[in-house]
Amino acid sequence: MVPKSDQLLIVVSILEGRHFPKRPKHLLVVEAKFDGEQLATDPVDHTDQPEFATELAWEIDRKVLHQHRLQRTPIKLQCFALDPQTSAKETVGYIVLDLRTAQETKQAPKWYQLLSNKYTKFKAEVQISLTLETDTKAQVDSYKAKAAPPRDGKVLASLAGVDPKDIVAVLNEEGGYHQIGPAEHCTDPFILSVTIAFATQLEQLIPCTMKLPERQPEFFFYYSLLGNDVTNEPFSDLINPNFEPERASVRIRSSVEILRVYLALHSKLQIHLCCGDQSLGSTEIPLNGLLKKGSTEINQHPVTVEGAFTLDPPNRAKQKLAPVPLDLAPTVGVSVALQREGIDSQSLIELKTQNGHEAEHSQKRVLTPIKEKTLTGPKSPRESPAPPPPPNQTPPTKDDATESEVESLQYDKDPKPTVKGIGSVPASLAQPEATCGASEVVTSGQKIAVPAASHHFCFSVDLRSVHDLELSFPVNCILRYSYPFFGSAAPIMTNPPVEVRKNMEVFLPQSYCAFDFATMPHQLQDTFLRIPLLVELWHKDKMSKDLLLGVARIQLSNILSSEKTRFLGANGEQCWRQTYSESVPVIAAQGSNNRILDLSYTMTLEDYGLVKMREIFVSESSQGVPAVDQKPSSPPPAPCPSEIQMEPRETLEYKAALELEMWKEMQEDIFESQLKQKELAHMQALAEEWKKRDRERESLVKKKVAEYSILEGKLQKALTELETREQQLASAEAELQRERKELQLERERNLQELQDSVRRARDDCVYQVELERLKLKQLEEDKQRLQQQLNDAGNKYKTLEKEFQQFKDQQNNKPEIRLQSEINLLTLEKVELERKLESATKSKLHYKQQWGRALKELARLKQREQESQMARLKKQQEELEQMRLRYLAAEEKETVRTEQQELLDIRNELNRLRQQEQNQYQDCKEIASGKLGSPRGSGLEEGLDDYLTRLIEERDTLMRTGVYNHEDRIISELDRQIREVLTKNSAS
């Protein structure tokens, strides 16, 4: 079995969130804390479903993981809301992960709800996955803790018994080298060299708001190599930096493994472009790629890291500056080489220079040597016009802010020969064989070979014609465009203006333009794909300002897909040509995106192949013609008086005068020749200076155009965001007005329904009150009538009582009379009882009728209430379905409660009547059994029959109302009583 790796990674994958509120002006960030180390995700937009898509990881071994699991160490995730404007940080909530749930197998992510959620109305959740992964890679920077050294360094240091943090470079002044690692084990000699070869586009590092401290400032590159401060030769021209490539090297005693750990700890070399004590820009060269794990290249040949590195201004991050285009980015060519001492090397590094024209005067080709410096101390051993930073001050860094401002980069200095060529050219930097001493400065005699790298291109654009005008008025138009990638930001315009009318095609004069430039093919393709050519249509009017009508967008990448044709160049080399023709619409610049007219164009791209060998030229124009410095010859001696008299023209005096005049004329000619030569030299110098100033102005204009383009892009973006926000605000206001109207209508409708309900309830109450009043009045009348009958019966009873007493007194002694009187009395009582029974029967029938009417009225009210409820339900069916259901339920519940109460009242009344009937029936039985002396069985049977008849009548009466059926409780009770009476009757 393969043993498990001891090195693990605790990986927390934070994928996405949901149920978050939308806060457009805030950002969301999640911070994870474990074992004292804190990691965080990148800020994302504060939307309802934020996308984090971030993995956070901690290095750990199995033993420490086991201890953390025993101690139940949690992983706490905190979610914050950031305000970019005020940098305010609000806590949204937190999540606690249990480390014991982490497994080495891949697990599906889970949703975790935020605890102590700030947004109480939203149940915000985050999708998180917690896993363990085997740490197999040598160095994974994204998984390291912030201050953790590479893992290879840990392993090697543990083998050597040395802490990686204790590995430092110590200067050995006697031996002239730096010792890295223990001296008894690290004895291999190495040479580490840094070469600064070229620099381009340095003027981009100085914005228009910066001012340099001097009128003629001197610039230099500064870096620290093993504690040694190194600066190169200063130069004063940022646009055309002219300095010799210099190599600074140090000798090292170490071993490959210890040196790899040291380079991993000090993995970056910072190079600053300085002016005085200010850092204008810097770049970082990675050193950890020199010695790779398991590589033995250092034993065969030197290992190098070289290339053109982009310089970044120190305040780009603070000011949030926009990125500079690739063709305008400031770069510095640097080569870092590491070799064993005694091995020769040659490294290639690209030299990029600006395009230019050849000088008119004769030039002499010389190869520029590379100056080499050997560093043995903490300071640079050479002297330079620009003093290096003092030992007690730190070197300029990215954070050093400059306090000055610049209007333009114009320097008044002596003319120097400039290096001109086409394209980018690499140079070979060779290193001398012999190693210098402890403090020597040696000039290498090897040369810079410049192999070709870029292609020479010629791009031409022919704006042929415009046609199909859509405007109602004629246009006096010119076309204008610019494309800084071709080497010039100056606009190209057609001239003179041409008049275009409807239904006509007009050919444009002076519309052909060709551009010669050098670049890499992939850079050309990338630029053509990203940046289209924008052609502006302007209307020229003599009475007013020029008016921008529209813009045509020409996609230059179309020519890359066209067919290639082969042709021979001027020197017989093989070249390629691509041609593309098309018509594009010109879209209105303002208002709606309507087409104004169509533009027909033809573009051609010619590839002349790789650029030729470029060498550095040194002008010979400084070798002036030497001035003629002749002294006039002494006049001839006077002739002796003894000589013979001669002709006047033959005399010595005449000849001397003639020679003197001829000498004067010759001197005048020589002086005029010298003046002409000096004038020519001054004119050439003036022309060179003028060209130089023109290039500087063009570069500054290009830079300002790029800055203004960036500002214009920001302004356009801000305007677009503002328009979007205005549209969102307008739509939100419209939605608010609509919702307000709907709420107002809903409120009015609900108020009207409430008023209708109140009115109906009031009418129902009034009707019920009137009905109760009528019932009360009728009951009062019945009461008075019954009271009158009771009084009459009482009076009649008293009269009969008196008569009976008198008759009784008279018939006390007569049995027949007494019996007769008793019979009569009983007969009267019988009649009275029959009358009472009839009255009670009538009262019962009347009560049954009243009860039936009440039940019918109840059924009618119930039916009417149901009909009104159905009408309301139909009216509110679409909007208030749930309210209708609740209302119906409450209504039915109230109706059932009312019916139950009425049934309870009816049941109580029935019980009362039943009790009354039973009492009457009992009285009748007692009267019949006691006074008449009739048989007990016949009376009981008649009572049961009457009771049975009464029960059957009550049941039938209730069934006829239509309110009750056989399943109701009262009907079931009546049926039960009827069965009991029938049973008793059959038994008797």
Curated annotation (Swiss-Prot):
<dbReference type="Pfam" id="PF12416">
    <property type="entry name" value="DUF3668"/>
</dbReference>
<feature type="region of interest" description="Disordered">
    <location>
        <begin position="354"/>
        <end position="425"/>
    </location>
</feature>
<dbReference type="InterPro" id="IPR022136">
    <property type="entry name" value="DUF3668"/>
</dbReference>
<dbReference type="GO" id="GO:0005737">
    <property type="term" value="C:cytoplasm"/>
</dbReference>
<dbReference type="GO" id="GO:0005814">
    <property type="term" value="C:centriole"/>
</dbReference>
<feature type="compositionally biased region" description="Pro residues">
    <location>
        <begin position="384"/>
        <end position="394"/>
    </location>
</feature>
<feature type="region of interest" description="Disordered">
    <location>
        <begin position="624"/>
        <end position="644"/>
    </location>
</feature>
<feature type="modified residue" description="Phosphoserine">
    <location>
        <position position="938"/>
    </location>
</feature>
<comment type="similarity">
    <text>Belongs to the CEP120 family.</text>
</comment>
<dbReference type="GO" id="GO:1903724">
    <property type="term" value="P:positive regulation of centriole elongation"/>
</dbReference>
<dbReference type="GO" id="GO:0007098">
    <property type="term" value="P:centrosome cycle"/>
</dbReference>
<dbReference type="GO" id="GO:0032880">
    <property type="term" value="P:regulation of protein localization"/>
</dbReference>
<dbReference type="GO" id="GO:0008283">
    <property type="term" value="P:cell population proliferation"/>
</dbReference>
<dbReference type="GO" id="GO:0010825">
    <property type="term" value="P:positive regulation of centrosome duplication"/>
</dbReference>
<comment type="function">
    <text>Plays a role in the microtubule-dependent coupling of the nucleus and the centrosome. Involved in the processes that regulate centrosome-mediated interkinetic nuclear migration (INM) of neural progenitors and for proper positioning of neurons during brain development. Also implicated in the migration and selfrenewal of neural progenitors. Required for centriole duplication and maturation during mitosis and subsequent ciliogenesis. Required for the recruitment of CEP295 to the proximal end of new-born centrioles at the centriolar microtubule wall during early S phase in a PLK4-dependent manner.</text>
</comment>
<feature type="coiled-coil region">
    <location>
        <begin position="706"/>
        <end position="929"/>
    </location>
</feature>
<dbReference type="GO" id="GO:0045724">
    <property type="term" value="P:positive regulation of cilium assembly"/>
</dbReference>
<comment type="subunit">
    <text>Interacts with TACC2, TACC3, CCDC52, TALPID3.</text>
</comment>
<dbReference type="Pfam" id="PF00168">
    <property type="entry name" value="C2"/>
</dbReference>
<keyword id="KW-0206">Cytoskeleton</keyword>
<keyword id="KW-0677">Repeat</keyword>
<dbReference type="GO" id="GO:0005813">
    <property type="term" value="C:centrosome"/>
</dbReference>
<keyword id="KW-0963">Cytoplasm</keyword>
<dbReference type="GO" id="GO:0032886">
    <property type="term" value="P:regulation of microtubule-based process"/>
</dbReference>
<keyword id="KW-0175">Coiled coil</keyword>
<dbReference type="GO" id="GO:0030953">
    <property type="term" value="P:astral microtubule organization"/>
</dbReference>
<feature type="domain" description="C2 2">
    <location>
        <begin position="435"/>
        <end position="569"/>
    </location>
</feature>
<keyword id="KW-0597">Phosphoprotein</keyword>
<dbReference type="GO" id="GO:0000226">
    <property type="term" value="P:microtubule cytoskeleton organization"/>
</dbReference>
<dbReference type="InterPro" id="IPR000008">
    <property type="entry name" value="C2_dom"/>
</dbReference>
<feature type="domain" description="C2 1">
    <location>
        <begin position="1"/>
        <end position="112"/>
    </location>
</feature>
<protein>
    <recommendedName>
        <fullName>Centrosomal protein of 120 kDa</fullName>
    </recommendedName>
</protein>
<feature type="modified residue" description="Phosphoserine">
    <location>
        <position position="934"/>
    </location>
</feature>
<dbReference type="GO" id="GO:0022027">
    <property type="term" value="P:interkinetic nuclear migration"/>
</dbReference>
<dbReference type="GO" id="GO:0021987">
    <property type="term" value="P:cerebral cortex development"/>
</dbReference>
<dbReference type="GO" id="GO:0022008">
    <property type="term" value="P:neurogenesis"/>
</dbReference>
<dbReference type="InterPro" id="IPR035892">
    <property type="entry name" value="C2_domain_sf"/>
</dbReference>
<dbReference type="InterPro" id="IPR039893">
    <property type="entry name" value="CEP120-like"/>
</dbReference>
<dbReference type="GO" id="GO:1904951">
    <property type="term" value="P:positive regulation of establishment of protein localization"/>
</dbReference>
